[in-house]
UniProtKB/Swiss-Prot annotation:
pH dependence: Optimum pH is 7.5-8.5.
Protein name: L-aspartate--L-methionine ligase
Metal-binding among keywords: yes
Catalyzed reactions: L-aspartate + L-methionine + ATP = L-aspartyl-L-methionine + ADP + phosphate + H(+)
Record key words, sorted: ATP-binding, Ligase, Magnesium, Metal-binding, Nucleotide-binding
Domain of life: Bacteria
Binding-site residues for ADP, renumbered to this chain: 136, 171, 173, 183, 186, 188, 215-216, 218, 223, 246, 290, 300
GO biological-process terms attached to the record: alpha-amino acid metabolic process; methionine metabolic process; sulfur amino acid metabolic process
Entry EC number(s): 6.3.2.-
Pathway: Amino-acid metabolism
Length: 397
């Protein structure tokens, strides 16, 4: 069962200097491959509060209301004191500038921001390096040319000619520095109708994208997010791995805990992490590694940044070790019913809260609330039964 007294194995403040402030919010400035709406981006700011420890985090005011305090209280936790809050684009960008220019802070960005918002000299992790490590076209550099499916990087104007030489199923990804997340920006094509949809998206992004990656679609038997952390004092630490839950088109449906990760998969991840560290990386990274029927490992995405399931791995001591599932939910419209249903399951001990974006901060039911959490229980069957009951209750209001 839940052990409320346990502390995380490792916290984010173990990895960063005292002058670092963390923001997980994507920039307000749009990007054709990453288009979460404003509320989703604000919701992301509360995701790491339980693993931050002393690391100051920039959080939207709606992600730190009394609702979150109530949920944390049930599990014996408190909202950290070391948070900086904002409430709109102007206050967010002003806060970042003030922290850097007036308070001599370095900002650790989950997603890079434009130079007009903050000059790269104020980044905790070198911006050029961060961009390079997360550029999908440069994956072969960080894997030493190993763990790669058949792939080709092409100029966007050559794409429609080149794609004629490929067979389905295939994957198309942006080959530039713009970030993607949760499968958005990754286009899996099983047939010509999928390809035509992808071509439409590519045309919309032509102004900001120079190149694309075409990749053989791996028929995987397992899809792991293998995670590591590094600081100079700690060295490289293996945090664990989570199984990625995605639909057939690669869209993210959460993570579940996994045991008995094959050693050669962990070792592949460690080699990639070592390459990043040798370039100057520090912090948390998670690598999407597929295993096919022949036990070959393929690196399909390298996230040299925190991942959605990082909290699940770092909070393992707090959770039932049987089965865990990380996911998030949106209110159906009645935010009070949404919150009360969540509170019920948190009190029952089957639902572990991570973040709560309070839509009522904007006015009653003006915006749909959102909730990030970990389900945990003795078995997968028990957890999924609880989740089904929870979803059914959310529908009845």
């Amino acid at each position: 069962m839940t052990n409320n007294g346990n502390e995380p194995n490792l916290t984010l403040s173990d990895l960063y200097d005292k002058d670092v402030v963390y923001t997980s919010r994507p920039s307000y400035i749009s990007n054709p491959w990453l288009k979460p709406d404003e509320h989703q981006s604000n919701f992301l700011t509360g995701r790491e509060l339980l693993i931050a420890n002393q690391l100051p985090v920039i959080v939207h005011e709606a992600s730190a209301t009394d609702k979150l305090h109530q949920l944390f209280q049930v599990i014996g936790k408190e909202v950290p004191n070391s948070i900086y809050t904002f409430n709109n684009q102007q206050s967010y960008e002003n806060l970042i500038k003030q922290l850097a220019h007036k308070e001599n802070k370095k900002i650790y960005f989950q997603y890079i921001h434009d130079e007009t918002i903050l000059n790269q000299q104020y980044y905790a992790l070198d911006k050029t390096l961060f961009v390079a490590l997360n550029n999908k076209a440069r994956i072969p550099e960080w894997t030493n040319g190993k763990f790669l499916p058949k792939r080709k990087v092409v100029k966007i104007e050559q794409f429609e000619n080149e794609i004629k030489n490929w067979e389905f199923p295939l994957v198309i990804k942006p080959g530039d520095d713009l970030p993607t997340a949760g499968g958005y920006g990754v286009m899996i094509c099983y047939h010509d109708a999928d390809l035509q949809k992808a071509i439409t998206r590519i045309k919309e992004a032509t102004a900001e994208t120079n190149s694309l990656i075409i990749e053989q679609k791996i028929e995987e038997k397992a899809n792991y997010c293998v995670q590591f952390a590094y600081s100079e004092s700690l060295g490289i630490q293996y945090l664990g791995a989570a199984t990625q839950l995605t639909d057939k088109y690669g869209f993210y449906n959460g993570n579940e805990n996994t045991t008995n990760v094959p050693e050669h998969v962990i070792e592949a991840g460690r080699q990639i992490m070592e390459n990043g560290v040798n370039q100057g990386f520090f912090g948390v990274a998670g690598f999407d590694l597929l295993v096919d029927e022949d036990d070959n490992v393929y690196a399909i995405d390298l996230n040299f940044r925190q991942n959605g399931s990082t909290s699940m791995l770092l909070l393992a001591n707090e959770l039932n070790s049987g089965y865990q599932k990380f996911y998030s939910y949106h209110s159906k419209g009645d935010n009070t019913h949404f919150f009360n249903t969540i509170l019920k399951y948190v009190k029952e001990g089957s639902l572990y809260p991570l973040s709560y974006y309070d839509g009522d901060w904007y006015g009653e039911d003006k915006v749909k609330s959102r909730f990030g959490c970990i389900w945990h229980g003795d078995s997968k069957e028990t957890v999924l039964e609880n989740e089904r009951a929870f979803l059914a209750e959310l529908e009845h209001y």
